[in-house]
């Protein structure tokens, strides 16, 4: 009897270590239960990519790897360019908080990587780097590199150098969402599930730089004045914006022709000059559209988007549509709601501007849609979410919606648009009425 009680205590203790929900993870818990190491993972062409690997102290059960690839900062860095990574410094990246905590709570190996040419990662960065490896993905024998081959090489290293169960998940929002799409195109067999969220997809037809071919000056001019810059060498510091617009945007741009704006940047923004020299939807833009290559995708895919996303609403729904069309056998899921860009990453999100749509919609998305999706496909545990989960705008008056949980308003469908749905034309009338 004592042996049974002892066995029960050991099992309960080992399971309990990872049984908490992500909302309960604290800095102290993370430091007690995770180690961090910073490595420079070699790619096939010799370039090395900065990678922060967070590994659970307990190795009682092999767990999956959750990978996020990003061009944005992963501060704090434990070393400077030209130095060797320090093994003694533990400082978690802000990327560990928010939408990754469920995976930390469950003991996943969490990996954050700066893509080629950003921060401490070597070689040159290229905006929405063209997909050159084609159907072969990372298995290509051509002497080329792209985001698919870099993902493939990263996964190979992770499988060999971390304790894991052999399954990899990849997720990301906005630009990292683009890299999640490229992970599916890497064709690595260990990548079982990916989630492109508000993914940069087509910078001409609808995402960031253009909307239906119309140049989005405000977005490009401010975001691009840092993102489109070329760095001189690897660094822990990002590129500063060249411009800061403090006045009214309309007044700022209305009196300036595009040539004047371009002249201000000169040769400092090579991608800006390329972009404005391709005013039509030509090969330059099509080469940078990953959705055109989404054929015969094998990993399960959860696409996430916000109806009020001003940056990459197009990318989410176009990615979903292209996967339905080009990869009908893919296990495809969609989650969408009345969110701004990346709004679902916040557990407490309940409104946008003056419109309210239910409390804690981000919490429901993270706990009841995204996490179960990855857990099912990476561990074979739990149940899959519905194929389509949508939180409609519905009633938006604060007096009626504040305090009501969003769980009451989510709708589930088998596909999107829903079967038997009929389109309705909406017209803007005088006095700004619909």
At which residue positions do the language-model features occur?
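A short loop-to-beta-strand scaffold at the N-terminal edge of the catalytic core in hydrolase folds
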Residues: 45-55
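Bacterial Sec-dependent N-terminal signal peptides
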Residues: 1-21
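Accessory cap/linker subdomain of secreted extracellular hydrolases
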Residues: 89, 93-100, 105, 127-136, ...
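Cap/lid segment of the alpha/beta-hydrolase catalytic domain
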Residues: 67-159, 347-357
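Alpha/beta-hydrolase-fold catalytic nucleophile elbow
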Residues: 171, 195-198, 335-338
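Alpha/beta-hydrolase fold nucleophile elbow
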Residues: 163-174
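Alpha/beta-hydrolase-fold serine-hydrolase catalytic core, especially in secreted/extracellular enzymes
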Residues: 22-24, 32-37, 42-47, 189, ...
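Glycine-rich nucleophile elbow surrounding the catalytic serine of serine-hydrolase chemistry
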Residues: 173-182
